[in-house]
Design a protein with these regions (language model features):
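Catalytic-loop region of hydrolases
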Residues: 25-92, 351
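Short beta-strand element of the alpha/beta-hydrolase
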Residues: 92-104, 114
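Alpha/beta-hydrolase active-site loop
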Residues: 158-179
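Gly/Ala-rich beta-loop-alpha elbow adjacent to hydrolase catalytic centers
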Residues: 191-195, 199
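C-terminal catalytic histidine-bearing segment of alpha/beta-hydrolase fold enzymes
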Residues: 301, 305-311, 337, 341-398
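Short beta-strand/loop motif that positions the catalytic acidic residue
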Residues: 323, 328-331, 335
Length: 398
């Protein structure tokens, strides 16, 4: 239930009004005039959301629009939901978990902050909420960005490393804008699938991007994006892939176009695949997978020039990311969406570079099992960080 009167929310509204000089309305996408002069993380609007049964350990849930930075560092509006734990903040403030969600789609209806029972991302949110409840029970405040272009103006540059870095880091900054004394400078990032790649990018560049904050570590659950160009190469060599791949691939194409407009998916795909591409502009991944019963007979046009697409995708690959903070990777051995061999190859790469990395496998685990079982692994990771033992995990790696 929404609480009609809440002292903390009143304080938050008052604080934000003092920062912005204007009253806060419910989040809206028509904020372009405000964003140019605002600093990254500045809150542009705030509204209270229902604390549903999904988040039993949350005292409040807030929806914010905040100033962030896009693919080319341009000012953008991004949205996120915030979960505050029960009880009063500790003396040094609540530590923060930034949650980077997995692939939902590129349409605005795919933004997790707008989730509702029976909605296109609700089944995923049900799984994610169990993991986030564990962090709330630990006394962490949670901020969950939607990423650029999900629920806000503009297209979603799916899997663009720079954009995902910015929206995650600036969401943490936005949380500190609410009431700085209530939040600790220490924070962690955890992400799944698409968000796993985002968490790895934050692990590589988060300290440099936000030196005023204290990033302690990152957790990547079944992270996508190893040799990211491989998805296009796979489709090229398998012109009639299984429907799940055919439903997912338009998200890759539209995400690439959002970041690099010279990539025009309609010029690359077959007319039959073009119909799926059109659906992907307004439908979420779960809907696309449900709708597509049979793959198109071909994906690409004959002689399509894929070099710009492959070059762009390769630039977003996680093997380009070298973490500067401890990283834990969790991967199911029966994951059919993220190849465990690629995830392990990335771990090998980091160990050869002598980066503090923990690799946890889930025997027989599928793509979502890394998220379902993240609570146990997170507890272990926190203990390792607290004892400063992460360096030992790759010390015997050959």
């Amino acid at each position: 239930m929404i609480r009609k009167s809440n002292s903390l929310l009143k304080i938050l509204f008052s604080s934000i009004c003092l920062i912005s000089g204007s009253a806060m309305a419910a989040p809206t996408t028509d904020l372009s005039k405000q964003i140019v002069s605002e600093k990254p993380g500045s809150i542009l609007s705030i509204a209270q959301q229902d604390v549903t049964d999904l988040f039993l350990h949350a005292d409040q849930r807030l929806l914010v629009n905040y100033r962030s930075r896009g693919v080319n560092d341009e000012p953008i509006v991004a949205s996120a939901f915030i979960l505050l734990p029960k009880g009063t903040p500790p003396k040094n403030g609540w530590p923060i978990l930034a949650w980077a969600h997995g692939t939902t789609g590129v349409a605005d209806t795919c933004a997790p902050s707008g989730d509702y029972a029976g909605g296109p991302v609700h089944s995923y949110q049900e799984v994610a909420s169990k993991a986030l409840n564990g962090w709330l029970a630990r006394g962490y405040a949670v901020v969950a960005p939607d990423y650029q272009g999900l629920g806000t103006l503009g297209a979603h540059p799916y899997m663009n490393a720079k954009s995902q870095l910015h929206t995650v880091v600036d969401a943490v900054r936005a949380l500190h804008m609410l009431k700085p004394k209530d939040f600790n400078q220490q924070w962690l990032v955890m992400g799944h699938s698409q968000g796993g790649a985002a968490a790895i990018t934050v692990a590589a560049y988060g300290q440099k991007d936000a030196p005023e904050l204290d990033l302690k570590g990152a957790i990547a659950l079944a992270p996508g994006g190893y040799q990211y160009e491989g998805i296009a190469e796979y489709v090229l060599s398998h012109p009639n892939p299984e429907p799940s791949v055919a439903a997912f691939f338009p998200i890759v194409l539209l995400g690439a176009q959002a970041a690099e407009p010279s990539i025009i998916p309609e010029n690359l795909v077959s007319p039959e695949m073009g119909n799926v591409l059109t659906q992907a502009r307004s439908r979420c991944l779960s809907e696309l997978q449900s709708d597509l019963k049979k793959s198109p007979s071909s994906i690409f046009r004959p002689n399509a020039d894929l070099k710009p697409l492959l070059s762009y995708l390769k630039q977003q690959s996680i093997e380009n990311m070298v973490p500067t903070v401890p990283l834990m990777i969790v991967q199911g051995t029966k994951d059919h969406l993220v190849d465990p061999r690629g995830t392990y190859a990335y771990y090998q790469q980091l160990c050869k570079l002598k980066k503090p990395t923990i690799y946890q496998t889930i025997d027989g685990g599928d793509h979502r099992d890394a998220l379902r079982q993240s609570h146990t692994f997170a507890t272990h990771f926190l203990n390792v960080i607290e004892k400063n033992q992460t360096k030992s995990y790759c010390s015997n790696f050959k």
